[in-house]
Amino acid sequence: CFLVRSTLIEGASHLLSVDPLQVEAGIEQLALAGRVAIEDWPHDPTDAAVYPVDLMLAEDRLSHHLGLLTAGADQERASQRAAHAAAVARAASTMGISLAEAQEEAILVALSGGVVVVTGGPGTGKTTIIQALLQASGWSREQVALAAPTGRAAKRMAEATGYEARTIHRLLEYSAQHNGFQRDEHDPLDVSLVVIDEASMMDVQLFDALARAIEPGTSLVLVGDVDQLPPVGPGSPLTDLIRSERVPVARLDTIFRQGEGSEIIASAHQVNRGEVPAVTPSGTPLQDFYFIHREVPEDILGTIEALMSERIPKRFGFDPLTEVQVLAPMRAGAVGVINLNLRLQELLNPEGPSLNVGGTTFRLRDRVMQIRNDYERGVFNGDVGFVARVLDADKALLVNIDGRAIRYEQAQLDELVLAYAVSVHKAQGSEYPAIVMPVTTQHFKMLQRNLLYTGITRGKKLVVLVGTERAMGIAVRNRDVAHRNTLLAERLRGETSQRLLEGVQ
């Protein structure tokens, strides 16, 4: 969200070949003009944090509204604990389940108002908490709001709970006409409980908008996996909220689905512990996780093609067009997103009516992805569909997205890309029956533990990794993800100082 002033001065003076004093003077002028905000940096009193104004305001407001939501929650929990514990016990009995202590505590906290974070890896019971919370609360469906950052995550949430679930943008009634949300502190959500799934995907600005629309006294439950990739946008507010130690955090570490023999779940947790999954020996009986050793990118590519065209359809019965998603850490290279899409399109859908747009050929039946939010048409970044008709005379396409026929005129086709292969970042918040993922040192810059972990956890029934133990080892040992400069945790703890220059009101 910000740059440390000394780092900004050094970097800008080097990039622009100007005296550092000129850069420093320029920063001061920007602050006086209200273009940037400068704050004391708690970690070094001789330095400062330089923010774009909108990000500083978002952090500041978010801290303020989270403070309002958590005020008085501890007293409420103590006074109502016995009644809430009885409600949770009844819910567990009705559902025929036994809740772990961490799960039960998370539900008790959520029933008492305030903010609670539920974080855990795959198979640790996050969805069970949401289901039991809804059962125990006694609130009507109109009193509950379920949402997620992406349409696909919201759809999965609805399927798991039987409740309506929306994107956060829909929940807050985003208006393209007004370029903003209709729900805020002046017109808040009229609900008693808000549950957000895949909360680790929220950036600071989206979280700010959400918190502004929730009245004090409302329960806010944030469910996510902080070990996945951070948000694409600025900040990492779920991580900061946990780091602040200002809200209850339920850390789920017991794997409840382990009894089903899921190697996907076991391997994901293995990666998260910094361990390299073993290469799958030849002749291994059918299972749900495989690591196939291949050294060079061309061999990795050939193996992925064989998996998609023959091995997975024949051995597991998955349709490679609709049920198998190839994930890649990067766009470039032999096994990057761009080349994989070209090769897989030619392999899986080589013929049929087509339309060439800006160097991309779209064919009938192609798997495609929307890459921008379009609120007027109700299609969002990350939505996946299939080309249903090629309207060659109009230079347009009809795309089937979740059962809806969306027409793309020629001017809108830059919102579509081929999606036989997508980046791990694009796949976050989604799940697929099967995924295939290259792991190669060609993607050295992106070999990170949280990226590998996120990729593995996208697969529900089958995960196949293709690459080298060396690349896997680099990834699982690399926890040095790009650091996010934020002060949200410090704001929540009351450790930030007044702005040095009040250029912003």
Where are these regions (language model features)?
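Accessory, non-ATPase domains that flank or precede helicase/AAA+ motor cores in DNA-metabolism machines
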Residues: 1-83, 504-505
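Conserved nucleotide-binding/hydrolysis micro-motifs of P-loop NTPases
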Residues: 43, 57, 151-154, 170-172, ...
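N-terminal pre-Walker A segment at the start of P-loop NTPase domains
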Residues: 85-101
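Pre-Walker A adenine-sensing motif
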Residues: 97-111, 313
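ASCE P-loop NTPase helicase motor core
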Residues: 104-107, 113-282
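Residue-level recognition of short, solvent-exposed, well-ordered loop/turn junctions
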Residues: 215, 361-364, 380, 427
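Conserved helicase motor core of P-loop NTPases
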Residues: 226-377, 388
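C-terminal accessory regions
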Residues: 273, 370, 381-505
